[in-house]
Amino acid sequence: MNYKMHLTPEEEEILNGGKGETMAKVMKTLVMYGDAFGATKMVPVTSKMGHLVTSFGLGVMQPVYDLMDQLIAGGALSSQKFSVDPKPLDPNVPSSFLKNIVFKKFMYNMQDSYDAQLAKLGLIDSKSYTCTCYMDEVGNTPKKGDVLSWAESSAVVYANSVLGARCNRNSGIIELFGSIVGRVPYFGLVTDEGRKATWIVEVKTTKKPEAQILGSAIGMKVMEDVPYVKGLDKWIGTELDGYAKAYLKDFGAATASNGAVGLYHIDKLTPEAVEQGESLIAEGAKVYVIDDAELDRVKNNYPVMWKDKNATPKLCFVGCPHLSYDQLVEWTENVCESLKKNGRSKISIPTVFTAAPAVVEKFNATPNAAKLKATGVVLSYICPLMYMNNPLAGKMPVITNSNKLRTYTTSRYYTSAEILDIITKEAK
């Protein structure tokens, strides 16, 4: 094949079939991908583990399953163990007879066989289904400077920004191919130049901005560009502690889903901003000022996709991306306190908190698990988005504090404080 980038002798050998026809096809795909984006060469994937975005066994994805079979048969397995996005189903999550038929017979009817394929390709274990693979409890936490082959947008933006790893916003399958060959094309966010900020965002709010709305505003403004955010340290500090990481997790997911951000820098907080400061800002960077009025404008312009905009919510999802352990504890305390204040013992709207299986396991080993269960809240490991993809679920009035879930589904966004108020008061 004709290609523009420079390949090492070892890479050329793989491309020419030296490690089998299947590996040659995988390498050819990566070379074509890199050429399309102007990559000059391939660079090694240096992270200990990979992560895949496609976790759901949709019946219509037969070409994907055929491809997986070809990879397995050809010995083109992942060179690194990997985690994968959350599973789509959990019997504990509120559903209906008809919804379950759609889920199991028409939508995710290939889940078991696909799970088996993932295990053969290199899945870490059955607890490794989460969009927040970087959580300490999960153990797939890249080091600063690690080159990754990931695709899940919320994980990519977190790894790039909060951990200082290097990864492009790859597509599903491409990220698996990078893990198989152990190389990715050198372009975009993998390069020094590609990590320069072309936007300066000045946060000038009078109170701590809601992570989901701030991220949404920035994502919609800068799209796929890199923003350098000033003024946020006033509200979330200059230490990357558990609180700041949880805030940035949700903030980043909103920038990535409401826009296409793959990397952001937070002045005085994120690793590269601490080390390099404003030298990360490219010449001619645009400026976006965010004040209280701008955040209100953004939130007030979210469309309501419900047929009846005044309907009583039938379901609430909290945890997209998956909640951290500290967030689970905080939500449990807040729900219990709010119920007590309102003279109630149970939530008024079916509510599901989602977190990584390993985080759920840790939480369930504490007294807080019984407290949360007593309120009626369901704790699950699923992907709320995969649940909402059911056409019957999409017709329901569902509420969430996730801007990502709002963007991709018919669910309605409320702030965390608003969600807490809604689910702990008498349903109207």
Task: Mark where each language-model region is.
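Non-transmembrane, aqueous-exposed alpha-helical and coiled segments at domain scale
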Residues: M1-K428
